[in-house]
């Protein structure tokens, strides 16, 4: 209640002042790189965040997709790929980009550029979760949600960075100092895959 009263008093003071003096404006641009490929923990986190699936559900769904030969081994903690697996990706990515929901990104995905998602060593026990390129048959709703997350993350990983402009405005009103922060996306880059906020 005290905070509410103070806020209302501040609002009335500023309303009475009828003017605001801008004392400083600052801008900066930042590039936000694409996220790494999924391991099981990150897949569970995103599936819960965006689709309200539990960790157990995601683990079981991912295991089912693996048994259908649609994705690589899911119970992994790695978010990297060994070079020999990376070298098999171009035809897999082509199949992904032929899907209507991702076709528009065909000219943006760049497999040639070195990425942090590649590991120099030739072998590793279980690499990051990727799709195999086998076309999915009939999947139920939850299977398709998890499968689409994995497809989308693979595309995101090989997309350009997201470019964001941050603006800070310092102002004075009714003898009170205010700082306002906002941002706008200049280039969506990888963030455009699922059209999410950064």
Region spans (language model):
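Core catalytic DNA strand-manipulation module of type IA topoisomerases
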Residues: 1-198
